[in-house]
A protein has these predicted regions:
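Coiled-coil dimerization/phosphotransfer module
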Residues: 1-178
């Protein structure tokens, strides 16, 4: 009986988080760099809060007052969420670090872990039914490239993984056909 109650509680919490994400994505008041990065930082902190993975955030006190389209926010959020999920699912990490910066006209979000890593030089299969096909990495890359950015993955077996999302701010205001 207690397992069922815990399961219902976990499911309810997941539904509430999903609803919060939907409301955030569709609210036009959040169409700024400052709102987006603040939300992403808080989301990362909350995401790891009950997991045993220590999470450090490196976020500037203030971000430039730059608009972001809702599509860009949505794709950026889903890519970052996938990177965080990969840390929990695959890395066996005890520590994560999320860094957010605006440099050289770009938004840069770096998600690092101290987990087991993988051979990032190994070819990625295109077989979507294969368990080792790196669907999450492919999805993150597609989401970010669809909004004009790039996703850089660096990983070494035994040393962890770093995923860097780079988004030119000049394209971040445009609605994109995806």
């Amino acid at each position: 009986m207690q397992e069922q109650i815990k399961s219902i509680s976990d499911d309810s919490r997941e539904v509430l988080h999903s609803m919060d994400e939907i409301v955030w994505v569709v609210n036009p008041q959040n169409d700024t760099l400052e709102h987006a990065t603040s939300y992403l930082a808080q989301f990362a902190q909350d995401y790891f809060s009950m997991t045993g993975v220590e999470c450090d955030l490196v976020v500037p006190a203030q971000m430039p007052p730059h608009p972001l389209s809702s599509q860009v926010r949505h794709h950026l959020f889903l890519a970052v969420r996938e990177a965080l999920a990969n840390i929990l699912k695959h890395s066996a990490a005890t520590h994560a670090k999320i860094s957010i910066a605006c440099e050289h006209g770009n938004l840069e979000i770096c998600v690092e872990d101290n987990g087991k890593g993988f051979d990032s030089e190994a070819p990625v299969t295109n077989n979507f039914h294969s368990r080792d096909s790196h669907d999450g990495l492919r999805n993150m890359t597609k989401r970010i490239t669809d909004v004009g950015g790039q996703c850089i993955v660096a990983s070494t077996i035994g040393l962890g993984t770093t995923i860097t999302f780079i988004l030119p701010l000049k394209t971040a205001t445009k609605e994109i056909d995806v």
